[in-house]
């Protein structure tokens, strides 16, 4: 990928340069990154609390208005370990991937996975604004089931919405 970016500068001047061994698999084009996000149905959030490391897979929705402005949204119960961890330590990591199949070979070591993946870091927050919660719920449903739903304020009040403001992102794939 000659001429491709090796790093993204994300909000706040954060540079993320992945020292990736397989440079031929590093995906840096914003449109391809968005395509990978579109193809993933689950995002895992990794966080830490007083009990230790914690990772949880969640369905999600997102807003993209440039590689330096990606917001991932998740819904949750209004209480629990995840919310306590985010409140205590809002810096988190995330991962999503799309397995596209198995590449077969003549020997066991020649087999491989065809995949695309995204990893990154983010600042997590609990959304309190009712309109943003309603929009986030709609985004989650649009991404998950490819259908638009509207939510009223009462429905939004019954769930917690977690927003990840992406600070760094890296994509990789086996094209």
Give short role names for the model-derived ranges.
Residues 36-37, 85-86, 140:
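A generic structural signal for nonpolar/aromatic side chains embedded in well-ordered alpha-helices
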Residues 75-76, 81-104:
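Helix-adjacent hinge/juxtasegments
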Residues 40-78:
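Short beta-strand segments
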């Amino acid at each position: 990928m000659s001429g491709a970016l090796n790093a993204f500068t994300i909000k706040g001047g954060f540079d993320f340069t992945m020292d990736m061994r397989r440079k031929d698999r590093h995906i840096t084009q914003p449109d391809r990154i968005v395509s990978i996000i579109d193809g993933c149905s689950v995002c895992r959030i990794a966080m830490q609390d007083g009990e230790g490391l914690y990772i949880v897979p969640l369905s999600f929705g997102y807003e993209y208005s440039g590689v330096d402005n990606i917001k991932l949204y998740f819904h949750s119960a209004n209480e629990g370990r995840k919310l306590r961890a985010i409140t205590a330590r809002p810096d988190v990591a995330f991962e999503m991937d799309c397995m596209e199949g198995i590449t077969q070979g003549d020997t066991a070591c020649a087999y491989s996975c065809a995949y695309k993946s995204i990893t990154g870091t983010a600042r997590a927050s609990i959304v309190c604004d009712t309109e943003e919660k309603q929009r986030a719920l709609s985004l989650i449903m649009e991404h998950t089931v490819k259908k638009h739903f509207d939510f009223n304020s009462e429905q939004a009040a019954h769930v917690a919405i977690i927003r990840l403001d992406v600070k760094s992102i890296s994509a990789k794939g086996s094209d």
